[in-house]
């Protein structure tokens, strides 16, 4: 049987909030079976819990943010959620003492390292998957995103940026996720931004924590980071990383193919909501025998079992 997973023990880190520029402490704790991912704002009294479900995503400008009915928010969840999805973690309590998850280095890699450092524990319940049985598609102008039936999890993703440095890189990628592909090929891809936008954001008290320490920064012609890129195709890979995290608010890993063109946080969330609303287009499945499971899901990507 493919079992549900959580972290073996509590793990803690500190970082900087991308938009506030303030120090943020993040704690990840084990959670019982069928908990899902629960976020907690510990800086509020009493502490406020926000479940990581699609309908709680109410802000998608520059990041994915969970917002409850009282307006309490936790922003920039997508890189942490990509790490949770990529390592197959179903259940966890995420405590944060600020309105945003720390940006770390702008990728999912620090979160992957953090989770692997304490180990991943299998739990005494079957892991549940959302198996796509019919295509679901959302569009916004020329942008679109779609989920289609597929045995496993495959991504077919294209970006289109009119920038000489990005145009030189690969802007279209198809990845059939094997047991190690996420950690090795995707998790280290950093968020990227343009100097002209950063100047505007800072003038509006946003991206105060943004720097070349946690983003790939471009001017009109080139990458400004002294060390350059981590992957030749880091731009499209980071958009895939974002999608990994955005899709995980569906509540379970997806068995299917995710195809997208120029999509972002807003359209990714629209797709998840459209999927959940179209109940004849998917089913919840588990795998009694490991041999029956799609290869992508037989072992969590790069996980270290304690």
UniProtKB/Swiss-Prot annotation:
Chain positions recorded as Zn(2+) binding sites: 79, 238, 242
Q: Which reaction does it catalyse?
A: a UDP-3-O-[(3R)-3-hydroxyacyl]-N-acetyl-alpha-D-glucosamine + H2O = a UDP-3-O-[(3R)-3-hydroxyacyl]-alpha-D-glucosamine + acetate
Output the GO biological process annotations, alphabetical, semicolon-separated: lipid A biosynthetic process
Task: Report the GO terms under cellular component.
Answer: membrane
Please list the cofactors this protein needs. Answer: Zn(2+)
Query: What EC number is given for this enzyme?
Result: 3.5.1.108
- Show the active-site residues: 265
Coiled coil ranges: none
Pathway of this protein?
Answer: Glycolipid biosynthesis; lipid IV(A) biosynthesis; lipid IV(A) from (3R)-3-hydroxytetradecanoyl-[acyl-carrier-protein] and UDP-N-acetyl-alpha-D-glucosamine: step 2/6
Function of the molecule: Catalyzes the hydrolysis of UDP-3-O-myristoyl-N-acetylglucosamine to form UDP-3-O-myristoylglucosamine and acetate, the committed step in lipid A biosynthesis.
Name it. Answer: UDP-3-O-acyl-N-acetylglucosamine deacetylase
Q: Which species is the source of this protein?
A: Shewanella piezotolerans (strain WP3 / JCM 13877)
């Amino acid at each position: 049987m493919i079992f549900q997973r959580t972290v073996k023990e509590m793990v803690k880190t500190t970082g900087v909030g991308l938009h506030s520029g303030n120090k943020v402490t993040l704690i990840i704790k084990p959670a019982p079976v069928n908990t899902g991912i629960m976020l907690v704002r510990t800086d509020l009294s009493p502490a406020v819990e926000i479940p990581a479900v699609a309908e709680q995503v109410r802000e998608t400008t520059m990041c994915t943010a969970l917002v409850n009915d009282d307006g309490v928010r936790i922003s920039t969840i997508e890189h942490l959620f990509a790490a949770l999805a990529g390592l197959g973690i179903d259940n966890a309590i995420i405590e944060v003492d600020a309105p945003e998850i720390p940006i770390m280095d702008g990728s999912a890699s620090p979160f992957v390292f953090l989770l692997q450092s304490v180990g991943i524990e299998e739990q005494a319940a079957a892991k549940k998957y959302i198996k796509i049985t019919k295509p679901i598609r959302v569009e916004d102008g020329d942008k679109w995103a779609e989920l289609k039936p597929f045995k496993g999890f495959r991504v077919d993703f294209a970006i289109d940026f009119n920038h000489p440095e990005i145009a030189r890189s690969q802007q279209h990628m198809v990845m059939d996720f094997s047991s190690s592909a996420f950690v090795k090929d995707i998790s280290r891809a950093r968020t990227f931004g343009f100097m002209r936008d950063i100047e505007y954001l800072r003038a509006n008290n946003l991206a105060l924590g943004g720097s070349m320490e946690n983003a790939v920064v471009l001017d009109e012609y080139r990458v400004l980071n002294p060390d350059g890129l981590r992957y030749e195709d880091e731009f499209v890979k980071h958009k895939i990383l974002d999608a990994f995290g955005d899709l995980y608010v569906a509540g379970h890993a997806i068995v299917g193919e995710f195809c997208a063109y120029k999509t972002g946080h807003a359209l990714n969330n629209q797709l998840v909501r459209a999927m959940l609303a179209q109940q004849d287009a998917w089913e919840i499945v588990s795998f009694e025998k490991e041999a029956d499971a799609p290869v992508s899901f037989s072992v969590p990507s790069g996980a270290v079992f304690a």
